């Protein structure tokens, strides 16, 4: 008997999604997978008024939570930051009684406007990507979630169509069975 793939909630946050070729290409395979729920935060909450109980219910229903977004000022777009602050509340995701996400999996999928070489101590951004993403790793730990190695698409705008298609295939393969041995 084959086990079902883990249910994945893909939280997509891009304020200018229509202009992001890379993110649109990455999302395409996700929309074709029955175990993946793609949840576009900017489409659902253009006014930033987040339905916290609805979002928390979505989190409870999924085992793997993917945060897909561009890197904005060494962080995430504003709506995702608001979502993190409001939805991952004390008593739900952390603190006394806050164990609703314990044991689930967190993976960040990030697009950047600069090459990987820009993320070094001696380079333009002065820090490696692992340091830049540390707040997200800490948030996962606060929620008692397993932190999965991030997927980073560097210099997303400058990737060829073939390179983006290759990234999308690999991403889609992972989403189809995210907790398979070697899949994390």
Curated annotation (Swiss-Prot):
GO terms for molecular function: electron transfer activity; FMN binding; NADH:ubiquinone reductase (non-electrogenic) activity; NADPH dehydrogenase (quinone) activity. InterPro entries: Flavodoxin_fold (IPR003680), Flavoprotein-like_sf (IPR029039), K_H_efflux_KefG (IPR023947), KefG/KefF (IPR046980). The keyword ATP-binding does not apply. One of its GO terms (biological process) is potassium ion transport. It is a peripheral membrane protein. Its main location: membrane. It catalyses: a quinone + NADH + H(+) = a quinol + NAD(+); a quinone + NADPH + H(+) = a quinol + NADP(+). It comes from the Bacteria. One of its GO terms (cellular component) is plasma membrane. Keywords: Cell inner membrane, Cell membrane, Membrane, NAD, Oxidoreductase. Signal peptide: none annotated. It is found in: Cell inner membrane. Its EC number is 1.6.5.2. HAMAP family: K_H_efflux_KefG. Regulatory subunit of a potassium efflux system that confers protection against electrophiles. Required for full activity of KefB. Belongs to the NAD(P)H dehydrogenase (quinone) family. KefG subfamily. Interacts with KefB. This is Glutathione-regulated potassium-efflux system ancillary protein KefG. It comes from Escherichia coli O1:K1 / APEC. The lineage of its organism: Bacteria, Pseudomonadati, Pseudomonadota, Gammaproteobacteria, Enterobacterales. The gene is kefG.
């Amino acid at each position: 008997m084959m086990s079902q793939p883990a249910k994945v909630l893909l939280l997509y946050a891009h304020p200018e999604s229509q202009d992001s070729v890379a993110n649109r290409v990455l999302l395409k395979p996700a929309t074709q997978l029955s175990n993946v729920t793609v949840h576009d935060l900017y489409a659902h909450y253009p006014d930033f008024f987040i339905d916290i109980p609805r979002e928390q219910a979505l989190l409870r229903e999924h085992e793997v939570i993917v945060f897909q977004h561009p890197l904005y000022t060494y962080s995430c777009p504003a709506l995702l930051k608001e979502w993190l602050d409001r939805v991952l509340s004390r008593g739900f995701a952390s603190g006394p009684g806050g164990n609703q996400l314990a044991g689930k999996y967190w993976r960040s999928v990030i697009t950047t406007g600069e090459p990987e070489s820009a993320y070094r101590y001696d380079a333009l951004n002065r820090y490696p990507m692992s340091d830049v993403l540390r707040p997200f790793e800490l948030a996962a730990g606060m929620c008692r979630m397993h932190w999965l190695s991030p997927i980073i698409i560097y210099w997303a705008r400058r990737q060829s169509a073939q390179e983006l298609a290759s990234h999308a295939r690999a991403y889609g393969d992972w989403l189809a069975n995210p907790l398979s041995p070697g899949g994390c």
